Amino acid sequence: DDCLGMFSSCDPKNDKCCPNRVCRSRDQWCKYKLW
């Protein structure tokens, strides 16, 4: 499976973002996890 890179649109219920990235429900983008 390909993961989603920075600022890719994503589905918060089905987060396919790359490691160390998280799908933000507010923006529906993959962003860096800061914690």
Swiss-Prot record:
GO (cellular component) term, any one: extracellular region
Function recorded in the entry: Low-affinity blocker of Kv4.2/KCND2 voltage-gated potassium channels. Is presumed to shift the voltage-dependence of channel activation to more depolarized potentials and to bind to the S3-S4 linker region of the voltage sensor domain.
Protein name per its UniProtKB record: Kappa-theraphotoxin-Tb1b
InterPro entries (UniProt xref): Huwentoxin-1
Gene Ontology molecular function: any one: ion channel inhibitor activity
Domain of life: Eukaryota
Domain remarks: The presence of a 'disulfide through disulfide knot' structurally defines this protein as a knottin.
Keyword Secreted included in the entry's annotation: yes
Expression across tissues: Expressed by the venom gland.
Chief place of localization: secreted
Cysteine disulfide partners in this protein: C3-C18, C10-C23, C17-C30
Quaternary structure and interacting proteins, as annotated: Monomer.
UniProt similarity note: Belongs to the neurotoxin 10 (Hwtx-1) family. 58 subfamily.
Record keywords, A-Z: Disulfide bond, Ion channel impairing toxin, Knottin, Neurotoxin, Potassium channel impairing toxin, Secreted, Toxin, Voltage-gated potassium channel impairing toxin
Localization (cell): Secreted
